[in-house]
Amino acid sequence: MCEEGETYCPEVKDAKQAKSLGKICMKCKESSAALLIRAGDAFCKSCFKEYFVHKFRATLGKNRVIYPGEKVLLAYSGGPSSSAMVRQVQEGLSRDAPKKLRFVPGILFIDEGTACGMSWEERQQILSEICSVLQQTKIPFHIVSLEQVFSLPGSVLQRGAPEQRPNYKEEVDRFLVQEREQGDAGCSEMLERLEVTDSDSPGSSDKMYQSTCSRPPDMHTQKLKQLFASAKTLTAKQQLLHTLRSHLILHIARTCGYSKVMTGESCTRLSIRLLSNVSLGRGAFLPLDTGFCDSRYGDVDIIRPMREYSSKEIAYYNRFFNVLPIFIPALDTKASENSSIQHLTEVFVNRLQADFPSTVSTLYRTSEKLNVSIIDADQETCAKDRCLLCLSPLDTQAGKASAFSATQLSHHLSQKIPMKSNDLANNSDKSCCQGGQGCKEAGYGDTCQSRALQTPSFVHMLCYSCRLTVKDMQSLDVLPQYVLHEAEYRCHRTEMRKEIQEFLLEEDDGDS
């Protein structure tokens, strides 16, 4: 019997292997399967491309946030997801596309090499690769360095007025009727307006590359290094980088006239962000941070068309259709698992996904059910009710029995500086280290008295998560000037409002 078993074992193994290799596509039922996305979801190469393209355009179509002829900025990082997003937009704008995308795209790449500790020579090498890739897309592109945050205006932290748009269906119908009435001449003109600009025209791409990829001033580079050096933890550095990147994207979008910004976060990335943001105290803003449309900025909306794709699907698409991402070192590259909350969460979710394939999809579906309930119409238009850094609605207006109030009380009791209002009022006009004495000799402990008085007024304008980020910074003076100026502006407005409060009419009095 043993000999018979040994004789038949190779045949049984070959039969199982032939059966697994002989799977056919679940869609066309004809071609052999080239990949397996999930258990039972086998696709051939052509059907997988059709499935991938359909999901992208269906995501944009069912949400109906991009109007015909609208300018959309594509946030490109060189990674797999944003590279696949750019390819989808590029193919959707071609003349042969069955359901053509009708918006006007532009691409933005932000050079974050200084924050990641890269030299200018290393950054130049990456920028040359980025520029060559973007030139092949024939889409207008912008390449800026992160150092430009030190030249941003304070208005970038102010919420813009949202544009009143007509009904989406009526706008599309009007656009199609206008196309038919204008005939062939109108169609060709519209195609020229919607067709992406040819970057290969003489001097166009070279001029853009030279103007956007020039070396930033050394003063700004040193300031950026000092800013990230002041953050004591990698968690705070990653949060700070995300905040500065968002401010720069918002400024470029407003300056160049883009009303929408596309980012390339995948389903896997958003699932990781869901858990990490809860750990970072951003649970109140999960619908904004993980939803399809983020409208916190008012005049510019952040949309995430790649949120339906897993990282596995994106990797398959890039592999089969020659989409070449560019590897760029990040802050957590070669870092240990416990180096930051974000990196630890990423390792945890990826390992869990390997053993339980429904982990990412479960987290993603959970995030879809979350809605923002703390914003009302009055708070949306009030700048003082929004965080100074992330521009999210403040989540610090909690009751005395809340966990936030308990945390604040514990923090105040643990401080060496007395928190009495009378003491703060008496010492508000005094300079630090008066009489030649140090702060420690003056009875204030090891903390500088001037910073102790300035920090509460600044922290009061931040949400709970941004307060934790600022708490991990050694100094607030290294922040960009537009942040400090906006904080001072809000303080002055608050003081002015207190002075004229008794002369203001309340809403009830006005209605009566």
Curated annotation (Swiss-Prot):
Pathway(s) the chain acts in: tRNA modification; 5-methoxycarbonylmethyl-2-thiouridine-tRNA biosynthesis
Skewed-composition ranges (Polar residues): 199-214
Keyword entries, A-Z: Cytoplasm, tRNA processing
Subcellular location: Cytoplasm
Keyword Nucleotide-binding: no
Cleavable signal peptide: none
Gene3D superfamilies registered for this protein in UniProt: HUPs
Record-linked InterPro entries: CTU2 (IPR019407), Rossmann-like_a/b/a_fold (IPR014729)
A single GO cellular-component term on record: cytosol
Region (Disordered): 196-215
GO biological process, one term: tRNA thio-modification
Family recorded in the similarity comment: Belongs to the CTU2/NCS2 family.
Name of the protein described by the UniProt record: Cytoplasmic tRNA 2-thiolation protein 2-B
UniProt organism field: Xenopus laevis (African clawed frog)
Designated gene of the protein: ctu2-b
